């Protein structure tokens, strides 16, 4: 039961042509647009596909799985096997991919990254989805941005594990003091949050035992293994 996470900046150079053409999804074959936002989204897809391809090789799973990516009814990309799952997130110029291999059952993962481009009205946003106790906790925190994106990213990661949109943010109950999360929109597992990367990161894994996670970053033309410092760990849907 091993999990792999890779991230990279879309402005870096990637040998995208090295991906066999038969492993490209239809969205990557679409003609280029003159619209800059569309171009950036297209670049994010390419980088995400490249990182997923790399992680499949690292995990020793067949890269031919890329040919069979399909979409759930909610639009979540998925593989046609139960023991391998992946999820993708991008924000600003950053892309992150999570891949989990579980030889003992189903793999379910979700990931969210946020690279803030501007300061927001955090209390007003929290009022839409956080409980009064969580909002009270937030007012006592010194690092407002970090605290807000902890509350936001963990919800997104949990919901993305099932392909559920942010309309259900308020359906995720977050106890920052006990470090527990409850939601009917995901199975039991663990969530990890970090603020030590060039972006905020949260990911969910449907595993209650000790996690085995390997982190990689694309830099200078190689996918280099790295470490995650000062991570915060949560129990998700823990039985009492």
Curated annotation (Swiss-Prot):
Keywords, in A-Z order: Magnesium, Metal-binding, Transferase
Annotated EC: 2.7.8.-
Pfam families: ACPS
GO molecular function, one term: magnesium ion binding
Cofactor(s) required, per the database record: Mg(2+)
Disulphide bridges: none
Keyword Transferase (UniProt): yes
Gene Ontology BP term (one): lysine biosynthetic process via aminoadipic acid
Family statement: Belongs to the P-Pant transferase superfamily. Gsp/Sfp/HetI/AcpT family.
Protein name per its UniProtKB record: Putative 4'-phosphopantetheinyl transferase PM0116
